[in-house]
C-alpha cells in the first residue's frame, strides 16, 4: 500500500474536560488590544497551544486512492476525508488505516448526485451529507443509509447567498451565510447566523451588526445569474467550537461572540481594538478588487486555545498573526510575507486578485512549520501534507535543522516524510 497524503494532527491543550469558558468576565468583556503594547516576535511556538503531535500517513488502497483533500474532519476515533472528485466520504482510523466509504450516488431514496459538505456526530455514530439534490441524508459509520432529516426545498429556501457553512455542536445544527447574494430578499431576512431545530427549521436568526443600515446596498449589489457582474462579497465568518463552546466572529466586526444554548443568544466574549484604517466598505467588498483595497487592515479568522487566542489578519502583502494571552492581556505579533496573486477571467477587463492568509506556527514539537489547514471537533488542528506539492509540503532540510522539544518525534517525522516522497507515486 502507498501513503500519498500525510496529516500532522495536534491535540489542543485544555480539551480533556467539558468545561466551557464563560462569555463575560466579572470585570466586563475582555479587550484584545492590537494597537498598544504589542510585541513583535520572529515566531510563535506550536507547543504553547498543543498537547501532542500525531504523524498520520493515510493508507492508500484500490478503494481509497485520494488525489488531494478538499474537506476533512478529525474525531476522537476516526479521520473523515472528502477529496472532491467521487462524492464519497472516506473513513480512516486515527492511525491512517482505510476503513470504508460513506455515501450512495444516484437519484433514488438515500442517494445523491453531489453534495456541498458533511458533518460527523461521533456520539451518535452518524454522518450527515448535505446533498445538492436530496436534502440532508444521514448514514451510519459503516455507510448504511438511515434517514433523511431535511428535504431539498427546505435547504434551498434557507439561503440567499452563494457562501454558506453548516455547524454541528453538542448534537445541534447551525447555519451561516455570507454575501454575495444570488437573489433578492427582504432586508429583514438578511441573516448571517441561524440556530436550527431537528427538522432544519430556523429557530432564531442573527444579523451581522455591520450589515445594519447597509441592507439595501448589499441586496442591490448581488450576483446576477444572467450575466457577470462585479458583485459585493464578504469573507467567511470565522467559527470555532473549542472545548465544546461555539464561538464566531463575523467579517468586518470587532467582536468575538459565543453562543449561549440556554438562552439561544450570541453574547460578546472578546472585543477587538485597533486604530488601523479599514478602508471604504464598497471598495473592500467587491469581488474583483482594486489592488489598493488590500492595503487596509483586516482580521479574517481567530483560533481560541486554553491560554491564548490567535487572530489572523493582513495589511498589504503581509500576514499578521496575533497571539493574545488570556491571563495577562499581553499581545505578541508575528509577521509573514504573502503575495497578492492575479488571474485573468473572461468578461472582465481587470484581474481577479486574491491573497492567502495562512495560520502558521513554528513546529517546535516535530520541526519545520505547522500550517493550520483545518480544525475539527473543537480540539484538533491539522496540517495536510501532499508529497510533490509546491505549497502543501515541508522542507525536510528545514526540519533537520530545527530545534525541537522531542527529538524522537522529529526523527519520526523525517522518516515518514522521506518514505512518502519515495513511495507516493505508483
What are these regions (language model features)?
Residues 59-64, 68, 97-124, 131, ...:
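Blade-loop segments of beta-propeller domains
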Residues 20-55:
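Blade/loop signatures of beta-propeller domains
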Residues 78-83, 125-131, 171-184, 240-257, ...:
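Short beta-strand elements that form the blades of beta-propeller/WD-repeat-like
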Residues 13-14:
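C-terminal motif of bacterial Sec signal peptides marking the signal peptidase cleavage site
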Residues 42-64, 90-104, 137-153, 187-228, ...:
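Surface-exposed loop/turn elements that mediate protein-protein interactions on large endomembrane-trafficking
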Residues 70-73, 117-123, 162-170, 221-243, ...:
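Structural signature of eukaryotic scaffold interfaces centered on beta-propeller domains
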Residues 33, 41, 53-87:
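Beta-strand-rich domains and repeat architectures in extracellular enzymes and scaffolds
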Residues 1-7:
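Sec-dependent signal peptide recognition
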